[in-house]
């Protein structure tokens, strides 16, 4: 809030612990007009990290257990009304969509199939280089996917260094899901 943001998406690795901490210990005590949404950064076995946002009230313990193949993750997320997209698709050496697949003789047809099923792409990651982020933006444009920006705050200095501009009427996960499904571009 002090940095001028109206809200945030908490997406820990394979866990909702950060969101639960906010919900159980912080919610309603400070900044009651600050929106906090729940997500997860899921570690797939074959395509690196995926950002997942589910409608409020949907509880899938499966999303806190790492290791599903990306295709199964996409199917489960969509079945329960959520959205999914690759985090830092060209970033981190072994934990990104493109670099993970490069080690496994990734074929353009498989990338196309996955990209058609994703709902968005993280196109700006504050902990990645401009070159890597530009490649992610090109990937999103090529497949006409909305882009998210994220701090990926594994380091204190990354907190609040990136954002995604969203309408003020997004107050819950379902609002965000509906919005992402309705647009082809999101302003960073």
Regions found by a protein language model. Give the residues of each.
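Hydrophobic faces of well-ordered beta-strands that scaffold small-molecule active sites
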Residues: 8-9, 36-40, 84-86, 121, ...
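Charged catalytic cores and adjacent phosphate/nucleic-acid-binding surfaces used
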Residues: 3-5, 17-26, 30, 44-60, ...
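Acidic/polar N-terminal loop/beta-strand segments that form early-domain functional surfaces
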Residues: 10-14, 24-25, 39-41
């Amino acid at each position: 809030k002090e940095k001028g943001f109206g809200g945030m998406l908490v997406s820990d690795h394979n866990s909702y612990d950060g969101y639960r901490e906010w919900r159980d210990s912080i919610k309603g005590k400070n900044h009651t007009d600050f929106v906090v949404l729940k997500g997860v950064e899921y570690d797939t076995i074959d395509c690196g990290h995926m950002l997942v946002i589910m409608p409020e009230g949907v509880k899938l313990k499966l999303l806190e257990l790492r290791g599903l193949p990306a295709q199964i993750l996409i199917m489960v997320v969509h079945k329960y009304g959520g959205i999914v997209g690759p985090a830092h698709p060209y970033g981190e050496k072994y934990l990104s969509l493109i670099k993970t697949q490069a080690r496994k003789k990734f074929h353009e047809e498989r990338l196309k199939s996955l990209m058609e099923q994703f709902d968005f792409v993280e196109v700006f990651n504050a902990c990645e280089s401009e070159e890597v982020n530009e490649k992610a933006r090109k990937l999103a444009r090529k497949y006409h996917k909305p882009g998210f920006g994220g701090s990926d705050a594994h380091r204190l200095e990354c907190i609040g260094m990136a954002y995604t501009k969203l309408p003020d009427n997004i107050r819950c996960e379902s609002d965000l899901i509906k919005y992402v499904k309705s647009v082809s571009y999101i302003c960073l």
